[in-house]
């Protein structure tokens, strides 16, 4: 606090350039060996050279599809792969990954193993006998559901939820989603239902706050209260 940010920005730029010189192929858009995590974490951390972001994301989606949407990552990938697929136009591919029920997957834990909490590792074997069965290690899937399906997000430019971003994704195969967040300013709620070929979105914004509701290429700014939109 109170220190000039310029030296830290310079250091960050130097590190970004170093990573890109060593690991990035600007012609192919591949980082390192092109794994799911390598592609996604570069996007997530903002180190991809300007103008190359979509190329890197396209390569990410290619490797995900080549792996038949199986999860090939740990902690860092669980945080970045679904989120970056969604950011760059591949939300349906992210959804396929998240709803997989064959191991390794979150769905396998629920449907086959009957877990109601998240284990520490994808595979619990005798050598991992001390692993936790209640671990947040792979918990970012819950954040993805809140941020991308329900679409409840904070605005980094307006801290403290003075301004809120509602950016739901109406993914195929789902007819109802609801998310709520008890912010410091009150309850934020986003719910959508698909009926008769249309989607009805109901959003509640706390008193004294504003929000941008973004669906596709349409953005509408609203104030506090409950707002019902049909798409």
What spans do the regions from the language model cover?
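Catalytic cores of carbohydrate-active enzymes
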Residues: 1-129
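Non-catalytic C-terminal accessory modules of carbohydrate-active enzymes
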Residues: 9-10, 14-17, 92-231
